[in-house]
Curated annotation (Swiss-Prot):
Its EC number is 3.6.4.-. It comes from Alcelaphine herpesvirus 1 (strain C500) (AlHV-1). HAMAP family: HSV_HELI. Associates with the primase and the primase-associated factor to form the helicase-primase complex. It holds the Pfam family Herpes_Helicase. The lineage of its organism: Viruses, Duplodnaviria, Heunggongvirae, Peploviricota, Herviviricetes. The gene is HELI. One of its GO terms (cellular component) is host cell nucleus. Signal peptide: none annotated. The keyword Plastid does not apply. It comes from the Viruses. It is an enzyme of class 3 (hydrolase). Transmembrane segments: none annotated. This is DNA replication helicase. Component of the helicase/primase complex. Unwinds the DNA at the replication forks and generates single-stranded DNA for both leading and lagging strand synthesis. The primase synthesizes short RNA primers on the lagging strand that the polymerase elongates using dNTPs. Possesses helicase-like motifs and therefore may act as the helicase subunit of the complex.
C-alpha cells in the first residue's frame, strides 16, 4: 500500500458519498410543477420591476476546502446523468473539458451571452426587498439588475428559433434528440456550474429565467411535462469575491465593487435558502486532496471556516515566510510561479525579470525576445461616441489611455511588460504599436479559444518514440478526422529519417550506413518504379537509400484512411529499426540525444525566429486554456489556420506586423498559435453600439507570475506568494493563495498577513453558515 498516493485513497473513500450526490440530484431533477410560468408574460414591454410569475427551480450546492475534489466529483454526474456542465470562467470550463474529455462551455456561453453584452450597463432594481420578501420578489430583484442583457438574449433567441419548434415531438424522439449533440438548456434540466462562487448573484436567476423562457418558447417535452430546472452550484463561497464593474462614460472611469456571489445568495439569503431547502441539498467536501500534508490541510480548514487561528497554525504559516527580496529576485526560486494581489505588481516583477535576463543573454534556454501588440482607434467612432456621451474634448489617444485597462481585460495583456514604440495618426484611424517582452523557455497559458497549428516536434528520440508507442497523440487528436492526425505523424516520420543518415555520415561509420540501408522497406512505402525487383538497381552504398526507394506520404484527402494507417505503421517500424541501429553503432544512450523534425525544412534564427521553407499547413486544433505551453519563439512564415474570417477588424499593415507565437506542448510537439484579434464596442444607455477600437495581440498569460484571483482553481507545483505592502489584505486572499500549492515544501510567502488583527478577523459571512452546516446531520459531509 505504500506506493499508493494518499490523494488516491482519499478520493476512493469519498466514492460512496459521491454516489449519494448523484442520486439526490437525479431526484431533484425529476420534480415537477403544475404551475409552469406562461412565457407570454415576457413580451417586449415586460419589466421585471413589475414582477411576474414565479419561476420554480431547485438547487444543490457542492462546496468545500480548496483542492478537496469538488470539480472532479462532477465527473460522476457527467457519467450518470444527462446534464449541461459549465464553468463560471473560461479556465474553469477548460479544466472541466480536460477532465471529462468533453466540451464544456462557460455558463455565459450556455445561455447566449455575447461579447457585445460586456459593456451593457447593469441597472438598479426598483423592487424593495424586506425581511419577509418571498422568492418571487428575490427572483425579479436579481433579474432586474441584469435585464438589459437578458432582454437582448431572448430577442435574438426568438429570431433564430421558431415558436413551438418542438411541440409536436414525441417523448421518445425528444429523448433521442437530446442525446444527439451537446446538452443545451432546452435538452436537459440539470445545469452544473463549476466555480459558482465567482459569479455575481444575478447569474443564478438569469439561468433559471432563461431555462424557462427557452423551453417555453420551444414547447419542449420537459416544459410540457412540468419539469423544473435543477441548478448544481459547485465552488467555495469563501474564496475570491465576485465583482461588479461599471464604466462611467461621462468621467471615463471604471468603477469596481464587490457584490454577492451565487453561493452566498443560496447559502446566506434566508428566503432563497429556505426555498431550496439548502440544509437537505448541500454536500461539503472536507479534506484537501491537492496537498495531503495534515498540518497544511488543517490550516486551510481554519481559514475557510473562519475559526480562531491557534498558535500552532500561526507558527506553521510563519515557517513559510522568506524575505521579500528573495521572492522579488528573478534569480531566486527559478521555475516557481509568483502570485501577487495586483496586476501592477505582476507587471513590475515581469519587468525586473526581463531586465535580469537582458543583462545575461548568454543563456540559450531563457532568451528574451520582443513582439508587437497593435491597436487601432477609429476616428469616426470616437466622434460619434463624444457626441453621444457629451465629452467634446476627448481625443482618440486620450480615450485609448483611459480604456487600456478595459481593452486588456479581454485578452489579459494587462500583466505584460509593454512599451509604446510608435503612434501613427492617419485620416481614418490612430494606430499605436506596443512592444511586449517574452522569455523563451517560460510557460504560458492561453486565455481564450485560440487555434493552434502543429508544425513539428522538438525533444529527444526517446520522447518521440514514447509518443508513438503510447499512441497518446492519436488518442487526443484522432477522434473526428483521424486521417489528418495520421497524415501529420507520417510526414514527421518521413522527414525525420534524414536525422539518422546525417548522424551516420558525421560519425563516418560505414557499418552504421549499411545497417540503415539494409532495413527492409514495406511495399506500401515504395515508389512504383522501385517495387519488387525494380528496387534492385545499383546505388551508391554511402547514400541513404530510404529516400530513393520511397515516395513522400500522401495528404489526408488524397487517399483512404486504411492506406494512411498502413503507411504510418510502415514508417513507425522503420523509425524504430533505425533507432536500434543508432543505439548499436553509435552509443547506448542515443535515445536521449536531441531530436527535431518538422513538416518542411525549418531553421531557427537567433534561437527564436522560426523560418519555414514553405507555408505552414499542419494539423489544426484548439489550444487548451488549462494546459501549460513552453514559449519557443515566433514565426512570420504564412500559416493556414482554416477558414478565414469574412471581415477583419484590423488594418492589413497592422496585421502584417504581428508574428505568430511558437510554443511547445507537454509532449514535445511544436505549435503555432493564432493571433487574438479583439474589437471593443461601447454599449450606450440608448442601446447604440459603437465599434471604437480593434486590438491585435497573442491572447496568452505568463505562468511566471499572475494575480491571486486569476490563480483560483489552478494547482501549482511551486508557489512564491508576495502579499506586498497592501494596507488591507483579506483572509480569503491568503486562503486562495496558499491553497494553490500541491506540496507544502514548495510554498513560500513574503509575510504572514494573518498576524495583522484586521486580516485575522476578516471572516467571510458565509463561514458561519458553513460551520452550522457541519453541525447539521442533514448536510452530506465528504471526507
Amino acid at each position: 500500500m505504500e506506493h499508493i498516493p494518499k490523494s488516491f485513497i482519499l478520493n476512493m473513500t469519498s466514492e460512496a458519498k459521491v454516489r449519494m450526490i448523484v442520486q439526490k440530484i437525479k431526484a431533484l431533477s425529476e420534480e415537477t410543477t403544475s404551475d409552469s410560468p406562461d412565457i407570454s408574460w415576457f413580451d417586449a414591454e415586460f419589466d421585471p420591476d413589475d414582477l411576474g410569475p414565479r419561476l420554480p427551480f431547485s438547487t444543490y450546492c457542492i462546496t468545500g476546502t480548496a483542492g478537496a475534489g469538488k470539480s472532479t466529483s462532477i465527473a460522476a454526474l457527467h457519467q450518470n446523468l444527462n446534464c449541461l456542465i459549465t464553468g463560471a470562467t473560461v479556465v474553469a470550463a477548460q479544466n472541466l473539458s480536460k477532465t471529462l474529455h468533453s466540451f464544456c462551455p462557460t455558463i455565459y456561453t450556455a445561455f447566449g451571452f455575447k461579447s457585445r453584452h460586456i459593456n451593457l450597463l447593469n441597472r438598479k432594481p426598483q423592487i424593495k426587498l424586506c425581511g419577509d420578501s418571498d422568492i418571487t420578489a428575490v427572483q425579479y430583484y436579481e433579474l432586474s439588475k441584469y435585464w438589459p442583457v437578458i432582454k437582448d438574449i431572448i430577442g435574438e433567441f426568438c429570431k433564430k428559433k421558431k415558436f413551438g419548434l418542438y411541440a409536436s415531438m414525441s417523448e421518445e424522439a425528444y429523448r433521442v434528440f437530446g442525446c444527439l449533440g451537446s446538452p443545451q438548456l432546452w435538452t436537459t434540466n440539470i445545469i452544473i456550474i463549476d466555480e459558482a462562487g465567482t459569479l455575481s448573484s444575478h447569474v443564478l436567476m438569469a439561468v433559471v429565467f432563461l431555462w424557462w423562457f427557452f423551453n417555453g418558447w420551444l414547447n419542449t417535452r420537459q416544459y410540457l411535462n412540468g419539469k423544473i430546472p435543477c441548478i448544481v452550484c459547485v465552488g467555495s463561497p469563501t474564496q475570491t469575491d465576485a465583482y461588479h464593474s461599471q464604466f462611467d462614460h461621462s468621467k471615463q472611469q471604471q468603477h469596481v465593487r464587490e457584490c454577492d456571489n451565487v453561493l452566498s445568495l443560496i447559502i446566506g439569503n434566508k428566503t432563497v435558502s429556505d426555498y431550496v431547502k439548502i440544509s437537505e441539498n448541500w454536500a461539503l467536501f472536507i479534506n484537501n486532496k491537492r496537498c495531503t500534508d495534515p498540518e497544511f490541510g488543517h490550516m486551510l480548514k481554519v481559514l475557510e471556516y473562519g475559526l480562531e487561528i491557534s498558535d500552532d497554525v500561526m507558527e506553521y504559516i510563519n515557517r513559510l515566510v522568506v524575505p521579500r527580496s528573495k521572492i522579488m529576485d528573478p534569480m531566486q526560486y527559478v521555475g516557481w510561479t509568483r502570485l501577487f494581489l495586483s496586476h501592477s505588481e505582476v507587471k513590475q516583477y515581469l519587468g525586473s525579470l526581463h531586465s535580469a535576463l537582458s543583462s545575461n543573454q548568454s543563456s540559450t534556454t531563457c532568451t528574451l525576445f520582443t513582439c508587437p501588440i497593435v491597436c487601432e482607434v477609429f476616428h469616426d467612432a470616437v466622434e460619434e461616441y463624444k457626441e453621444a456621451v457629451n465629452v467634446p474634448s476627448l481625443t482618440p489617444l486620450e480615450w485609448l489611455a483611459r480604456n487600456t485597462y478595459r481593452l486588456s481585460n479581454y485578452s489579459q495583456f494587462i500583466d505584460q511588460d509593454m512599451t509604446t514604440v510608435s503612434t501613427d495618426v492617419g485620416e481614418a484611424s490612430t494606430k499605436v504599436t506596443y512592444a511586449t517582452k517574452f522569455v523563451k523557455g517560460s510557460y504560458v497559458s492561453v486565455n481564450g479559444k485560440t487555434k493552434k497549428c502543429f508544425m513539428g516536434f522538438m525533444g529527444t528520440y526517446a520522447q518521440f518514440k514514447r509518443v508513438l508507442d503510447s499512441e497518446s497523440f492519436l488518442d487526443t487528436h484522432g477522434h473526428e478526422q483521424p486521417e489528418h492526425a495520421y497524415a501529420f505523424l507520417c510526414q514527421l516520420l518521413y522527414n525525420s529519417m534524414y536525422n539518422f543518415y546525417q548522424a551516420a555520415v558525421q560519425s563516418d561509420c560505414a557499418s552504421y550506413i549499411s545497417a540503415l540501408n539494409n532495413i527492409p522497406i514495406p511495399e506500401v512505402l515504395c515508389a512504383p518504379a522501385h517495387s519488387e525487383l525494380a528496387c534492385s538497381e545499383p546505388l551508391n552504398e554511402g547514400e541513404d537509400l530510404f529516400y530513393h526507394k520511397t515516395l513522400p506520404p500522401p495528404t489526408a484527402r488524397s487517399t483512404s484512411l486504411a492506406n494512411i494507417i498502413a503507411i504510418y505503421q510502415g514508417l513507425k517500424d522503420i523509425f524504430i529499426a533505425r533507432m536500434e541501429a543508432a543505439t548499436r553503432y553509435q552509443m547506448p544512450n542515443f535515445g536521449y540525444s536531441s531530436f527535431n523534425t518538422f513538416l518542411s525544412n525549418t531553421i531557427v534564427k537567433n534561437n527564436v525566429d522560426f523560418v519555414s521553407a514553405e507555408p505552414i499547413s499542419g494539423l489544426l486544433d484548439y489550444a487548451s486554456t488549462v494546459e501549460s505551453y513552453m514559449l519557443q519563439g515566433y514565426t512570420f512564415s504564412p500559416i493556414y489556420f482554416g477558414k478565414l474570417p469574412l471581415q477583419s477588424t484590423l488594418s492589413k499593415d497592422l496585421r502584417d506586423k504581428l508574428p505568430n507565437l511558437v510554443v511547445r506542448d507537454a509532449d514535445g510537439f511544436i505549435c503555432c498559435l493564432d493571433n487574438n484579434l479583439t474589437k471593443m464596442t461601447e454599449n450606450l444607455e440608448s442601446g447604440a453600439q459603437i465599434h471604437m477600437c480593434s486590438v491585435g495581440d497573442y491572447g496568452i498569460s505568463s505562468k511566471l507570475a499572475m494575480t491571486i484571483a486569476k490563480a483560483q482553481g489552478l494547482s501549482l507545483d511551486k508557489v512564491a506568494v508576495c502579499f506586498g505592502n497592501h494596507q488591507k489584505i483579506k483572509r480569503s486572499h491568503v486562503y486562495v493563495a496558499l491553497s494553490r500549492a500541491t506540496d507544502a515544501n514548495n510554498l513560500v510567502i513574503d509575510s504572514n498577513p494573518l498576524s495583522n488583527r484586521e486580516c485575522e478577523m476578516d471572516i467571510c459571512k458565509s463561514s458561519k453558515h458553513i460551520v452550522a452546516a457541519l453541525c447539521n446531520p442533514q448536510t452530506l459531509l465528504i471526507y
